[in-house]
Amino acid sequence: MQFQRLRLSGFKSFVEPTEFRIEPGLTGIVGPNGCGKSNLLEALRWVMGANSAKAMRAGGMDDVIFAGSGARPARNHADVTLTIDNADRTAPAQFNDDPILEVVRRIDRGEGSTYRINGREVRARDVQLLFADASTGANSPALVRQGQISELIGAKPQNRRRILEEAAGVSGLHTRRHEAELRLRAAETNLSRLEDVARELETALNRLRREARQAEKYKRLSSEIRAVQGAVLYARWTEARDHLERTTSEATAAARLVEETARASAAAQVAITEAEAAMPPLREEATIAQAILGQLAIQKDRAEREAEAAAAEFERLSNDLSRIDADRAREAQAKDDAAAALARIAPELEEVRALVAAAPERGPELAAVAKAAEEARAAAEAAVEQLAARVAAEEAQGRAAAARLSEAEARANRTNRALEQARAERAAVGPEVDPAAADARQRFANAEAALAAARAALEEAETARVKAAEQEAQARQLARSVEDQLGRLRTEARGLAQLTAPRSKSGHAPALDSVSPDKGYGAALAAALGDDLDAALDPKAPSYWGGAEAPAPVWPEGAEPLAPLVKAPPALAARLSHVAVVTRANGDRLQKELKPGMRLVSKDGDLWRWDGFVARADAPRPAAVRLEQRTRLAEVEAEIDVMAPRAEATTIALKAAADRLRAAEDLLRDKRRGPPDAERLLTQAREQVAKFEREQALRAARAQSLDDTIGRFEAEKVEADAALGEAREAHAAAQTSGDLQPQLAEARQAAAQAREAAGAARTALDVETRERAGRQRRLESLERDRADWSKRAEAAAKRAESLEGDRVKAAAALEAAREAPAALQEKLVALLDEFAAAEARRAKASDALETAETTRLNADRAARAAEQAAGEAREKRAALVAHLDGARQRFAEVASAIREQARMEPEELGRHVAGEAVAVPKDAAGVEAHLFALERERDAIGPVNLRAEEEAQEYAGRLETMRSERADLSGAVTKLRAGIEELNAEGRERLLAAFDVINANFQTLFQALFGGGQAELKLIESDDPLEAGLEIFACPPGKRMASMSLMSGGEQALTASALIFGVFLANPAPICVLDEVDAPLDDANVDRYCNMLDEMRRRTQTRFIAITHNPVTMSRMDRLFGVTMAERGVSQLVSVDLSTAEKLVAA
């Protein structure tokens, strides 16, 4: 297979449809940094099935879609198409019928990628296998991205093995082996499950055999139980007959006891009435005595609290007086301390002032002396620096002049030799122009125009098809949405119609169906009429509205009559005329003004009736719900009337859109047949033009290069001659300089003396400044202390004066508080006497009431005992009556059960049981116990499978079938394991064969690149070639053999390049992309690199694409394409000549 062209649309920076032709030989791609050259390589990897966003330099796969620029909006999809020539029929079987394969990958934002081969949608794995079988793919080592050489150098041996696998063509084997292993694991899992199922069937078969034995025992016990059940029935009938006779006699005795206890209970009630009549006067006296006692207790508690408060107030005032005396003493002490401090500060302050006034002002004099000494020091040091600089400059000038003279002479000689050689080479090159080139270009232009027209027509057809598909999808979505909405409305309408259908059992329509309130008043109407709305209007109904005359009521202000707000039949007019609507806030207030028959409601459903009844809105009202349902039904039916025509219109629009889509697809199929013929003609014309352009470009490039070289060498010769003259003059001047060393020594001695004098002057000035500043700071500190103590003395005097006034007030309040406790104590004593008298009165009244209560309680207990006895008698009689009824019913039920179950009368059953041979007890309990024992034994068996025998036979047949299937599956597992071993063996054989070939090629290419030396590849880390790592050992000329990690950067790059090209020679891939592989190489190595490219082109059918910035590499290409970004953020692909390529790179 051969790659022919790559077409991009909306991929990264290639927003416009762009086609890149992949021709035989060497194709170069040039352009400035950041213009999108590497996007071509990433598009090729992407269309071959790359699934890593990181490998695409993207955060997510949606990032490969054009994200927009300043002038262009973002796209929502991107697609890349790779056209492959399959004339040799080497594609997989499902695609091998077509001579041309067109692989398309399309991604829609947020929806993922789809793959198509010749228009048929396929899986990503199918695309990956297609390229893997051709020894290429998204991760092929033949696609060398930026930095991949460095990654190969730094890769682990295990990771390097991948290039061997690609060269050996075992990448597809890996995938097939993985699929076989998956099938093997699935088969082993199925085998394990089959064995589990077989074990389960064996267990189930054993269980069914046990169940068959249990079923046999179950049948035997059931037969015996049926024989005993007749004896149980007869024993129950005998007991029921005897129980009926006993209960009849007990009921007669209980009736006589009820009459006696009723008379005793009536006498006890008379005693209770007499005792209760004597108690009200005693209760009144006890209440009065208790009230008086409570009032006196309150007064006593108040007096006690007042006495305690007076004592506490006296104590507080005493404490305040003591505190004031202590504060006066403290302020007096503070005043004395301030006076003492002021007396101590005054003499010291006068002394410091005298020192400050007496000290002479020597600062300016000393500052002037220090300044003069510093100026002298600076002048001396400046003189030393000037002399030292002159000495150093003269020495340096002498050395530099000699070096420049030698260098200028050598440069002039080199320039003259190079200029002569370049002129000789330029004379040998002459421009030649082929007249046939113009005809070839015209044919190429015509073919290109024809292809552009065919593609434009195809693009228009594709656009029309996409547009039609979008319109059809929109129409389908709209039709589905309208249909769904209409269906929901119709479903809701049917449900509401069922809920609101008349529910009267008599068949008469309720009044609710004839009532229609205004919007928002449904809850008010339901609150006003409630369940009365379910009554009919037909007089023949069990409950109906007959209508009545009623005067119109007068409503209070704020109430609005409900009748005008409701459409209702005349029969409801009287009821509605007595209902008004109010707000919830006014309902409670206006309810008091209602007359009989009137009621108020709110819009929320609250109800206020004239008789005081109130029902809030949250109370459930079925009538309100039905009114809301009827209102919603009317709204839904109106919406259905609107939606039905719209649904019909969308259906018609969908059919029209589908017709347009089919027409667009037919047109697209017709237009797709046009571009292939035009492309074949264009390919032929392009090859002829490319041949002429290559020859002319090589000649022009060589001539231009030599002209530029001659011009550069002539300019360099002029510069070299001028530099030689200047160097000679500078060297002569440097020899005439004098000796300045004695002057420099004298200047250094004078500078040292000036520094000593300046230091002494600065020291004297600093001492004087510090002493004067210290005296000034001490003076300021003493003045601040004197001011502070003065303020303290004034504040203490003011506080003492204030405290004196507080003490006078506190003494007066204390004197007044001395008399209050004694007066309050006398009041408390008087209240205690009154409290004792009231307590005695309350005790007397309580005793009398307690005696009366005791009498009433005794009578009550006697009445309750009599009533209890009467009740017990009645209960006993009722119980006996019930027992009698139960005995009669039980006797009848047992007799009926005998007739139903045994088909005979009880007496006949007794004779039948007596004649049975079954040994059972004589009493009913014993017979039932025996029956219970038999039933318990049967129940102990548990659930019984009566079909166990048939199921056991069925399970035995299934088990035999499953054993046969297990044998077949075991054979399949053995075959899969053998197949995997065969794949592994084939992979090892092919990998070792490829290793030997690649190793030999690598050694040959290494020696060609380095001009000698040795190199070899080794498999390490495992004896199995499929698991081993690949290590590179190399020995450039003049060095020892070592691993590649110990070589220099340039040597590593050349060695890695030799390995990559060695892979090509072993199993050439259809395409090789080299993204700036020559970037780390110098000019000599770039030339070797290009020679190797020429050799690979000669020896293989691989088509090489080199992305480069190197002019040498450009000049060795068969054709050049440029990637530009004239519009910010948008890449364009153009054909260029060599001079244009150099300008692009310089940009």
Swiss-Prot record:
Disruption phenotype: Mutants show abnormal nucleoid morphology and DNA segregation defects. Mutation also causes a cell cycle arrest at the predivisional cell stage. Keywords: ATP-binding, Coiled coil, Cytoplasm, DNA-binding, Nucleotide-binding. It is found in: Cytoplasm. One of its GO terms (molecular function) is ATP hydrolysis activity. Disulfide bonds: none annotated. Residues 765-790 have a biased composition (Basic and acidic residues). Pfam families: SMC_N. Transmembrane segments: none annotated. Its main location: cytoplasm. GO terms for cellular component: chromosome; cytoplasm. Residues 173-221, 288-327, 365-496, 646-698, 743-880 form a coiled coil. ATP binds at P32, N33, G34, C35, G36, K37, S38, N39. One of its GO terms (biological process) is sister chromatid cohesion. Gene3D superfamilies: P-loop containing nucleotide triphosphate hydrolases (3.40.50.300). Residues 497-517, 760-790 are annotated as: Disordered. Induction: Induced during early S phase. Belongs to the SMC family. Required for chromosome condensation and partitioning. HAMAP family: Smc_prok. Homodimer. Contains large globular domains required for ATP hydrolysis at each terminus and a third globular domain forming a flexible hinge near the middle of the molecule. These domains are separated by coiled-coil structures. This is Chromosome partition protein Smc. The gene is smc.
